[in-house]
């Protein structure tokens, strides 16, 4: 798994691309200690990996020494020195938290690295003011598409005049004034063995939390059935996404044990407060195990790629709840609630003008999980990373 290497416009690497990355005078100087370093000076020490999958980083310049990390294709590294090692030249590199040796043949450097870095680096803008207007065109007199929140960050697609062109979601692109943003470029970087273990542990933890939450939901439904004398037919809920990924394609009426049959809008009938709470917890935990999976326009696969409504549709389908396919269908089919009253497991909707074009799942703590765009994939954002226009519930 790759890690991102962040460059705050100017900083430890101080890279200034010809695309217009700018260091502003009102930024904190402590973040930019070497702002005068040129692109040419820095790229003489930068390498970009060119490998089929990944190569190991070694403690010494030979293949029998201890592995200290791994680096994937198109990752950036700083070359600290070139040494003679087993089979020829090796670089001593630093990338992320990893320092070690790797054969020079696996990297490109100099002008070739500079050109490639400009294509593989991902630039982001972080809003540093409240209620920043996203405009349709790079002009202060242009129509406002939505309002962005302080601290949220967005993919930068380009620069026009004193505006950044940003991709908020795959379905929303607009312009923001540069003076209200701080930008940075991120590259993939090497990972240590400990970081690799930690990543796998976090993935397994999310899967286990989903399995535990679903088991708790089933237990709550069984207890309710016993207490109420209901002999409900249990619908199996799969916590394993590989087994359940296509479940949202089923068209049969849903039955959730402890609830009545799903209504035409997909909402289950009355259930106990305990079952409702467990359902919300399970939906959120189930959704979070797909964090980092790809965004694919028109996609409905929770593992291989989904768009915003394909993601929410698939999550709810795993619990026998039919939402509809598009964000507009889901906004219409759910029971509308106040945005201020949203709870974990409810849906928030976003629009361009009067046209709903994005949906996200509220997970609590002022955050949503959603399939945003091809750069970020399925990600967690502040609920007001753009202004929500509607909220609905499919749960009560």
Language model features by range: what are they?
Residues 2-56, 69-73, 108-133, 147-150, ...:
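SH3-family beta-barrel domains
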Residues 61-66, 138-143, 330-337:
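Short alpha-helix capping/helix-loop boundary micro-motifs
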Residues 67-104, 146-179, 255:
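SH3/SH3-like beta-barrel superfamily modules
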Residues 69-73, 146-150, 281-289, 309-317, ...:
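Solvent-exposed, polar/charged alpha-helical surfaces in well-ordered, non-transmembrane soluble domains
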Residues 291-344:
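Catalytic cysteine-centered active-site loop
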């Amino acid at each position: 798994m790759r890690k991102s290497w962040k460059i705050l416009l100017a900083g430890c690497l101080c890279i200034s691309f010809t695309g217009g990355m700018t260091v502003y005078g009102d930024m904190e100087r402590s973040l930019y200690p070497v702002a005068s370093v040129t692109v040419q000076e820095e790229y003489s020490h930068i390498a970009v990996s060119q490998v089929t999958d990944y190569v190991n980083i070694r403690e010494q310049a030979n293949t029998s020494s201890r592995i200290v990390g791994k680096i994937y294709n198109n990752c950036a590294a700083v070359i600290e020195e070139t040494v003679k090692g087993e089979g020829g030249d090796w670089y001593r590199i630093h990338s992320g938290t990893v320092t070690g040796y790797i054969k020079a043949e696996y990297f490109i450097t100099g002008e070739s690295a500079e050109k490639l870095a400009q294509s593989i680096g991902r630039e982001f803008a972080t809003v540093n003011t409240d209620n920043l207007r996203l405009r349709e065109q790079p002009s202060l007199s242009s129509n406002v598409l939505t309002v962005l929140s302080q601290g949220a960050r967005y993919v930068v697609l380009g620069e026009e005049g004193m505006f950044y062109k940003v991709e908020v979601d795959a379905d929303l692109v607009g312009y923001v004034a540069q003076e209200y943003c701080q930008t940075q470029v991120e590259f993939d970087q090497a990972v240590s063995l400990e970081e690799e273990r930690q990543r796998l542990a976090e993935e397994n933890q999310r899967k286990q939390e989903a399995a535990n939450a679903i088991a708790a939901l089933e237990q709550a439904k069984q207890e309710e059935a016993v207490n109420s004398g209901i002999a409900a037919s249990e619908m199996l809920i799969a916590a394993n996404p590989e087994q359940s990924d296509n479940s949202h394609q089923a068209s049969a009426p849903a039955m959730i044990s402890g609830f009545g049959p799903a209504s035409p809008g997909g909402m289950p009938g009355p259930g106990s407060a305990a079952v409702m709470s467990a359902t919300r917890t399970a939906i959120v935990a189930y959704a979070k195990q797909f964090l980092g999976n790809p965004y694919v326009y028109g996609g409905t696969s929770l593992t291989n790629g989904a768009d915003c409504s394909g993601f929410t549709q698939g999550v709810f389908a795993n619990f026998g709840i039919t939402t509809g396919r598009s964000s507009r269908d889901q906004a219409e089919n759910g029971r509308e609630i106040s945005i201020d009253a949203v709870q974990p497991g409810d849906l928030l909707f976003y629009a361009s003008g009067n046209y709903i074009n994005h949906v996200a799942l509220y997970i609590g703590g002022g955050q949503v999980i959603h399939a945003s765009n091809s750069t970020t994939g399925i990600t967690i954002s502040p609920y007001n990373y753009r202004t929500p226009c509607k909220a609905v519930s499919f749960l009560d």
